[in-house]
Amino acid sequence: MLPMSDTRSSRIKPMTLNFGPQHPAAHGVMRLILEMSGEVIERIDPHIGLLHRGTEKLIEYKTYLQALPYFDRLDYVSPMSQEHAYSLCVEKLLQCVVPPRAKYIRVIFCELTRVLNHLLNVSSQALDTGATTPLLWMFEERERLLSFYERASGARFHAAYIRPGGIAADVPDGLLDDIHAFTESFPKLLDDVDGLLTENSIWKQRNVDIGVVSKAQALDWGFSGPMLRACGIPWDLRKSQPYEIYETLDFKVPVGSNGDCYDRYLVRMAEMRESISIIRQCLNGIPEGPVKTDDRKIAPPRREELKYSMEALIHHFKLFSEGYKVPEGEAYVAVEAPKGEFGVYIVSDGTNRPYRCRIRAPGFAHLQAIDAMARGHMLADLTAIIGSLDIVFGEIDR
């Protein structure tokens, strides 16, 4: 037996620990290889690819309309934001003009999607740190939002509602009134969650000064969305590079100051309030009119036309069997998705299928910083850090 003073025994070898992919706080199929010194994290090596489906390659074999549903299945917590980015990119290549009513409905549903995403993130982050009540309250409101999705598109998650040229169909009667009623009652829930968490001493101990990221680090890592704004950088694509009707809307960009888990929570809570304000403005200003472009080479004709017009029937058949040809060229469009900058880059060779489609997922940039964020923290802090990252592996692995 070696004496305790022996140099060989005084060097503690780091313990290697597997975190996930079957772990309730892993938020999907995340696998982390942790190097631990006791309870302190010395290094993290994230392993990705367990949900890789080859989405970018699959898109090359589909027409532009058939490729749309793949985007619902990337970040499956906020599907319409990704449909929106893809549709805007295709419209940029087609130089297609979308009717004003369709733009308003797109923005309404994109902001509902932001609320949908942040409700899940805040409630699951709270659950990961031991608070169960917010999950029960917030999931009740998520159900209401998913019912709006279902009434508009027929599906709770994979909506395929925002399409190149406009939207799939106008909203059913009474839906906009119900969304307005939701905007009236929803702030009460935010006030209740605020009262439960924001000044709660246990919540603050678990999140303040945990996973701190400086402004310079956030820019170096390629952060965007709430992760970037929590560091104090007021970068929001809806303000800096406005698309659709955002330049006509009045809203603030919430920012943090410390760049820690607590600030990321505060930013997301404030963003939900701003989204409600945006939805109200859209509901008050939404015009009447068509919801699809009148170019029948891009959007299908109205169903009534199919009963008496042979030309409409031919357009409908050609559109859904062959699709439309997109002019040769390339385009990149990014939208302010709930998790950050979601970008779509399409190269067209003039056929009815994309030659190349590159997807820029915000969660990919955020996950790569987990080693720097968690180093030196306790193992118990890792769940708070992962919760504040707001990652979904559908978009990271693609």
Swiss-Prot record:
Catalytic reactions on record: a quinone + NADH + 5 H(+)(in) = a quinol + NAD(+) + 4 H(+)(out)
Topological type in the membrane: Peripheral membrane protein
GO molecular function: NAD binding; NADH:ubiquinone reductase (non-electrogenic) activity; quinone binding
Record Gene3D superfamilies: Cytochrome-c3 Hydrogenase, chain B (1.10.645.10)
Annotated EC: 7.1.1.-
Coiled coil: none
Compartment(s): Cell inner membrane
Signal sequence, renumbered to the chain: none
Gene Ontology cellular component annotations, sorted alphabetically: plasma membrane
UniProt keywords, alphabetically: Cell inner membrane, Cell membrane, Membrane, NAD, Quinone, Translocase, Transport, Ubiquinone
Cysteines joined through disulfide linkages: none
SUPFAM superfamilies membership: HydB/Nqo4-like
Key word Transport present: yes
Domain of life: Bacteria
HAMAP family in UniProt: NDH1_NuoD
Record-stated family: Belongs to the complex I 49 kDa subunit family.
Subunit organization: NDH-1 is composed of 14 different subunits. Subunits NuoB, C, D, E, F, and G constitute the peripheral sector of the complex.
Function: NDH-1 shuttles electrons from NADH, via FMN and iron-sulfur (Fe-S) centers, to quinones in the respiratory chain. The immediate electron acceptor for the enzyme in this species is believed to be ubiquinone. Couples the redox reaction to proton translocation (for every two electrons transferred, four hydrogen ions are translocated across the cytoplasmic membrane), and thus conserves the redox energy in a proton gradient.
Official protein name in the record: NADH-quinone oxidoreductase subunit D
Originating gene: nuoD
